């Protein structure tokens, strides 16, 4: 008969093996989900390739970019002349020639091209080669101002109409729209002008009938779709343009749209059978890095200033901030540390924004500290760094903002500082957006990831097929020598649920910061739970555990709306009940070693602190 100790030993062995199997099952389930998503993407890609092949075989081959890459069209000579003599360029970038030719042939087209790929040229050049004018719809007045400044420097006649335009200016533009001898080639308006101005629509109709309106360009076309990252209701009214003016060519442009968003936007704009040209998302010269944001604001600013005055000394850059207030404060702090910085945000006077933009373009300012209002349409080629003072509200925004670096195809760095508190500041801002929280969590997941190639993560988001080996160690994760393991954090998640339930029983709500304080045995004693030990981990690690639990839906956000602010609280999430199952395990990827072993892609890829020691750029311990 077996002894009790022997049976106990075997029981422990079986329990241990079952626990290991549970972890493997969870990992396999997660992998299955990833593979099913990738299978769906690949199936759609194969279907599209088969449709393209069938179209080519039937002679209907104008859907392929290759059909538009020739230089023997009737307009090719004029196109080449304008490219060289007006835009001062010797050659086209990928897909520019194809898009210009399709537009000149009066085809409707959607162009998906990375930030910095040269989308604006694809409608500006055809406008100069046509007899009439092209109407350009842009979401931001600041974007239109930036575009006009560049066009004026090139000697191109362009203007804009907005709510602040004087009656005299509006009257002058309306006259030019009908003048066959006018040199006006581009008229920029916001979508509100189309949706709400009957007078302007009447003028457009007369211009169309007179053969003066030759094209429409819808910039940031993803704004049409409620599934896009920056949905704007007035964009939905733009379908009237193709219905009223069927013979014009319409081009929709974006750097950040998934296939689902593109299809939705095409339907809204009444161009469901348009051509779609998609450039590769990859910018091989950009180095992507995520860093933990220092807890001290003073240390953080000093950290950024050391980078700018050291590695990036004399080099041009952009710093993106969460709010207008942040951008102003960061600018002042950097100026005190010897950085030639200027602020840029939408609430500034137009002449002040233009002044900052002009000074930065002329390298009189080294850095622009800005909100998202800055950058769309910016064509400064030698931006060597884009620093995010806080993360973007979505992967689409981050891809677009970081893409303003390195347009000259030389190496540039994209450094994102990721902080726990930023998640909930941004969440409170996007909660009213249709998919705002979902897109924010995708961004957070990107920041939390400590092992997967950054380009692979971006590719996965945009439904691209990507081989991580092609990164060429141009991201922080691909530069790491660290090995990783799955750490069981089930007990930590159970502790969080107990604290939240105790608060709920007291009819109290906990903000993320109060939850951490209660977990660490700080703050109000009423939130501390008997039997929940204070974890022997630094606060930074506890923050990452909470974020992981939030992303995995063991926790969820709840909001309280006041007259002055939207406040984020944490509550028990929909998957929390699983934590009471004995076999259920929550795991999180961590470094196997506590020592940093970051191998830089270049000598510049590691930050050097004030004492000359290399700091790790790893996000999670």
From Swiss-Prot:
**Helicase ATP-binding domain residues:** 100-275
Listed binding positions for ATP are 113-120
Q: Look up and give the organism this protein is from.
A: Rattus norvegicus
Q: In the record, which positions carry Phosphoserine?
A: 597, 602
Q: Mind listing the UniProt keywords for this protein, alphabetically?
A: Acetylation, ATP-binding, DNA-binding, Helicase, Hydrolase, Isomerase, Metal-binding, Nucleotide-binding, Nucleus, Phosphoprotein, Zinc
Q: Which PROSITE patterns match?
A: HELICASE_ATP_BIND_1, HELICASE_CTER
| Modified-residue entries (N6-acetyllysine), positions | 514, 522
PANTHER family named among the record's database cross-references: ATP-DEPENDENT DNA HELICASE Q1, DNA HELICASE RECQ FAMILY MEMBER
> Which SUPFAM superfamilies does the record cross-reference, listed alphabetically?
P-loop containing nucleoside triphosphate hydrolases
Task: Tell me the protein's name.
Answer: ATP-dependent DNA helicase Q1
Question: Which EC number(s) does the record attach to this protein?
Answer: 5.6.2.4
The record's free-text note on cofactor binding: Binds 1 Zn(2+) per monomer.
Q: Tell me, what does this protein do in biology?
A: DNA helicase that plays a role in DNA damage repair and genome stability. Exhibits a magnesium- and ATP-dependent DNA-helicase activity that unwinds single- and double-stranded DNA in a 3'-5' direction. Plays a role in restoring regressed replication forks. Required to restart stalled replication forks induced by abortive topoisomerase 1 and 2 lesions. May play a role in the repair of DNA that is damaged by ultraviolet light or other mutagens.
Q: Where does this protein reside within or beyond the cell?
A: Nucleus
Cystine pairs:
none
Question: Key word Zinc present in the record?
Answer: yes
GO CC terms in record:
chromosome; cytoplasm; nucleus
Q: How does it assemble?
A: May form homodimers or higher order oligomers. Interacts with EXO1. Interacts with MLH1. Interacts with PARP1.
């Amino acid at each position: 008969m077996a002894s009790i100790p022997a049976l106990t030993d075997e029981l422990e062995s079986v329990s241990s093996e079952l626990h290991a199997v549970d972890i493997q099952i969870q990992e396999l389930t997660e992998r299955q989900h990833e593979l099913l998503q990738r299978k769906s993407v690949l199936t759609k890609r194969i279907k599209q390739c088969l449709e393209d092949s069938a179209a080519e075989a039937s002679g209907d081959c104008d859907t392929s970019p290759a059909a538009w890459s020739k230089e023997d069209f009737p307009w090719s000579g004029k196109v080449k002349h304008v490219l060289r003599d007006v835009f001062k360029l010797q050659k086209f970038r990928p897909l520019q020639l194809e898009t210009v030719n399709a537009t000149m042939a009066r085809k409707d087209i959607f162009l998906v091209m990375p930030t910095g790929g040269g989308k604006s040229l694809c409608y500006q050049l055809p406008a100069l080669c046509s007899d009439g004018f092209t109407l350009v719809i842009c979401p931001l007045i600041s974007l239109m101002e930036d575009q006009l400044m560049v066009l004026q420097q090139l000697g191109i006649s362009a203007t804009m109409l907005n709510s602040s335009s004087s009656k005299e200016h509006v009257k002058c533009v309306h006259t030019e729209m009908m003048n066959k001898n006018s040199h006006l080639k581009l008229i920029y308006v916001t979508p509100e002008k189309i949706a709400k101005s009957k007078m302007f629509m009447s003028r457009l109709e007369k211009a169309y009938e007179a053969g003066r309106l030759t094209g429409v360009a819808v910039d940031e076309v993803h704004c049409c779709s409620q599934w896009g990252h920056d949905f704007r209701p007035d964009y939905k009214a733009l379908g009237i343009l193709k219905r009223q003016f069927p013979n014009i060519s319409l081009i929709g442009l974006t750097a950040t749209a998934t296939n689902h968003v593109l299809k939705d936007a095409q339907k809204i704009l009444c161009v469901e059978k348009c051509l779609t040209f998609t450039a590769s998302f990859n910018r091989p010269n950009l180095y992507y890095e995520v860093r933990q944001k220092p807890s001290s604001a003073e240390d953080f600013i000093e950290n950024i200033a050391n980078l700018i005055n050291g590695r990036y000394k004399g080099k041009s850059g952009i710093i993106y901030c969460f709010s207008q207030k942040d951008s102003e404060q960061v600018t002042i702090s950097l100026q005190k540390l010897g950085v030639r910085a200027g602020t840029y945000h939408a609430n500034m006077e137009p002449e002040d924004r233009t002044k900052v933009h002009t000074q930065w373009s002329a390298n009189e300012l080294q850095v622009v500290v800005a909100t998202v209002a800055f950058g769309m349409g910016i064509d400064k080629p030698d931006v060597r760094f884009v620093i995010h003072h806080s993360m973007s509200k979505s992967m689409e925004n981050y891809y677009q903002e970081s893409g303003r670096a390195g347009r000259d195809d030389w190496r540039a760095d994209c450094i994102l500082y990721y902080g726990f508190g930023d998640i909930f500041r941004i969440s409170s801002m996007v909660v009213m957006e249709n998919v705002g929280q979902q897109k924010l969590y995708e961004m957070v997941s990107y920041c939390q990831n400590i092992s997967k190639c950054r380009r692979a993560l971006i590719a996965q988001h945009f439904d691209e097929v990507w081989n991580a080996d092609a990164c060429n160690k141009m991201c922080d994760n691909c530069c790491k020598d660290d090995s990783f393991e799955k750490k069981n954090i089930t007990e930590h998640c159970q502790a969080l649920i107990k604290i939240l339930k105790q608060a709920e029983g007291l009819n109290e709500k906990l903000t993320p910061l109060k939850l951490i304080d209660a977990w660490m045995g700080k703050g109000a004693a009423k939130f501390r739970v008997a039997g929940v030990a204070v974890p022997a981990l630094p606060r930074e690690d506890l923050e990452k555990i909470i974020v992981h639990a939030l992303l995995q839906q063991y926790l969820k956000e709840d909001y309280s709306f006041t007259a002055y602010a939207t406040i984020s609280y944490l509550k028990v999430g929909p998957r929390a009940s699983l934590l009471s199952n004995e076999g259920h395990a929550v795991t999180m990827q961590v470094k196997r070693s506590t020592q940093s072993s970051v191998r830089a892609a270049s000598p510049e890829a590691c930050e050097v602190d004030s004492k000359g020691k290399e700091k790790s750029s790893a996000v999670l311990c």
